[in-house]
């Protein structure tokens, strides 16, 4: 549950120096209250990974990229800053995390990023060109670190979400790009080929052929 301090946390931002927030993870994470910063190591994409994924996904001008399970928006915000000709959309079930993402977006003054409060199964995947996935379903499994207790968890949901994403990716056209981080790859159809990996294989770059 958010504290009063979390709810009204507003870092002092000088938008003339927006770039400094992207110089390090430590600097960027101070955009958020301490309770959110504490989750960064396990749950939020690091800046070096976000930058590499963004440059791969934003190969097309005006590409629309969906982050499935966007949390507090760190990937979307970093990607939007580094690839300003692409459009980033983050979908997240937890309203509290959407709040923190929106505050950070406003403070950074980024216009090519939007956040959607809801379940990714409610979205029309035809509206998006490429996808980023940081194993958002994994916390449904027993014994895993969970962000909070505000949503339901179960092995059944883990399997359902993986099957659903698999089917949506199956329907995407040739050339669709996908970046996965720390994924077990059960959501990746066979016609997506891994063309590169980085960060000891945890980050993978896929293209549908």
Please state what every model-predicted region is:
Residues 1-60, 100-126:
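S-adenosyl-L-methionine
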Residues 62-71:
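Conserved class I S-adenosyl-L-methionine
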Residues 74-85:
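Conserved SAM-binding loop of SAM-dependent methyltransferases across substrates and taxa
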Residues 87-92:
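Conserved SAM-binding motif I beta-strand of class I
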Residues 96-97:
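Conserved short alpha-helix immediately C-terminal to the canonical SAM/SAH-binding motif I
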Residues 128-142:
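Short SAM/SAH-binding signature in class I
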Residues 140-209:
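C-terminal substrate-binding/active-site "lid" region of AdoMet-derived donor-dependent transferases
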